[in-house]
Structures are given as C-alpha cells and as structure tokens.
C-alpha cells in the first residue's frame, strides 16, 4: 500500500549520491529513513513485525465493538479507519503520540476510562516487550 517505512544503512564506501539513489528507490514503496547499522534490529522489529501487532489491535478493537452489538464488518471498518487516521495524524503533525492521546481524553470521559483499562492490562509494557522479543530474536539469527 506504499505506506511502509524502510531502514537504509549506507555502507562505508557509499557516496552521498549512492545514499540519495537508495533513498529514492526505497521511498517508492513508502518512507525511508537513514539509520546507523546498530539500530537495524530495532527498525526491523518496529517496521517489519509491528503490522502483525497492529492487525491484532484492530481485531481486538473490532471484537470489543462486536461484543457491544456492532456487526463484525462494520466493526473492522471502524477499527481500521481509526488506526489509519490516528497514524496519519502522528505523521502529519509530528506531535508526540502522548499529546494526541491527551487531546482525545476528556476529563472523566469514556476515552480516559478506556486508557485506564488498557494501563491496568499493561498495554504499553506488552507492546514494548513484543518489540524487545523481536529484537532479541533478530540478534540470535
């Protein structure tokens, strides 16, 4: 869908022209970011493995909506659109995701209750642990 993000690690003999060419080629598939080689495992885990985690999140959002009575097809559409729109907002604004989250959470509202429930379930720690597991597996390969 041309919406991925590729890591580019120029070799020691690469010129600026080589790097620019590589970036142009990789950007034909989405975004491309130049990183030092030591960050390749983290980039691979974040860009390469995370789609599976996002799919699981979309599925869980939809399952919650189905449990509340929404037909599954509509639930998937709502969930996927919410995730896509949220990601686009982070990319377009450059704002910290936590700031954007705070903007959506009304005091005493439904969203902050959902955030609290996610925190009780160690949502962020679970996601961070998944990335760490991917990085460790990549290092072992």
Where are these regions (language model features)?
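Solvent-exposed alpha-helices and their adjacent loops that cap or buttress functional pockets
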Residues: 1, 24-27, 46, 93-94, ...
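A short acidic, helix-capping loop that chelates divalent metal ions and anchors anionic groups
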Residues: 1-5, 43-44, 113
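Internal alpha-helical scaffold of NAD(P)-dependent oxidoreductase catalytic cores
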Residues: 5-42, 55-92, 137, 141
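Short pre-catalytic strand/loop immediately N-terminal to key active-site residues, enriched for Gly-Thr
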Residues: 39-45, 97-102
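Aromatic-residue-lined binding/catalytic grooves and analogous aromatic/hydrophobic interfacial grooves
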Residues: 50
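NAD(P)-dependent Rossmann-like dehydrogenase/reductase catalytic/cofactor-binding core
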Residues: 80-141
């Amino acid at each position: 869908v041309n919406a991925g993000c590729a890591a580019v690690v120029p070799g020691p003999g690469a010129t600026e022209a080589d790097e620019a060419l590589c970036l142009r080629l990789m950007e034909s598939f989405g975004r491309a970011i130049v990183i030092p080689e030591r960050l390749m495992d983290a980039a691979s885990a974040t860009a390469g493995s995370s789609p599976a985690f996002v799919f699981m999140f979309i599925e869980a959002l939809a399952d919650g909506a189905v449990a509340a009575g929404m037909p599954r097809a509509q639930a998937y559409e709502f969930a996927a659109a919410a995730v896509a729109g949220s990601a686009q907002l982070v990319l377009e604004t450059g704002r910290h995701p936590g700031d954007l989250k705070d903007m959506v959470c009304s005091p005493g509202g439904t969203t902050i209750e959902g955030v609290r429930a996610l925190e009780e379930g160690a949502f962020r720690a679970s996601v961070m642990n998944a990335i760490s597991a991917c990085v460790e597996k990549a290092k072992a390969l």
